[in-house]
A protein has these predicted regions:
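Feature of Fe-S/electron-transfer and energy-metabolism proteins
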Residues: 1-182
Length: 182
């Protein structure tokens, strides 16, 4: 199956460890060393993200400095669209879901299998808390009670890193009443 690393071709997975720009020698070395897992390094963790002003917009939304209608209107006016193939306008999607009766749930699909799908992993491996903050702003604007995150199996290291960041977030949520994240 595709391992979502087109930008590192040829790429091979040894167990769940990606080998970028693979050669016979580099793959054999990973096999001999029994390197079968991978955790991204050098990403912006929560402390660094907050030091750069991260979670400020979320806290402003929760604190009432921004109202739901203006945030959804900003999304609609931005022209931002989903990149999963259909190109559905994100602001319209937020409004449609917001207008449905509760409970409202959110499914975050970090891999829809489209060409260029490695973009999701590329951003997430570098700046996971920006993704988390955006997800929580969307949840606030739409009135979400539970969030379900899907990440493809081939992104094992990314999943381990994201699980650690989400665990830290649950231990010290940026606001009371944060939605459950699964």
């Amino acid at each position: 199956p595709c391992i979502g690393r087109c930008e590192q071709a040829p790429a091979v997975a040894v167990g769940q460890h990606p080998v970028a720009y693979a050669s016979c020698e580099s793959v054999q070395a990973k096999v001999k060393a029994a390197v079968t897992t991978h955790t991204p390094s050098g990403f912006i963790d929560r402390a660094a993200y907050e030091a750069q002003g991260g979670y400020r917009l979320l806290k402003q939304c929760i604190g009432g400095e921004h109202d739901v209608e203006s945030v959804i209107k900003t999304m609609e006016d931005s022209g931002l669209r989903g990149l999963g193939g259909a190109g559905f306008p994100a602001g319209r999607k937020w409004r449609i879901v917001r207008n449905e009766t509760a409970p409202r749930l959110m499914a975050v699909n970090i891999d829809e299998g489209e060409p260029g799908t490695f973009k999701d992993r590329w951003y997430l491996e570098r700046d996971p808390n920006r993704f988390i903050e955006g997800m929580l702003i969307a949840a606030w604007a739409v009135g979400i009670s539970k969030i379900y995150v899907y990440l493809r199996d081939e992104y094992h290291g990314c999943r381990a890193m994201l699980e650690a960041e989400l665990s830290a977030l649950r231990a010290h949520p940026p606001y009371p009443g944060m939605p459950e994240i699964h």
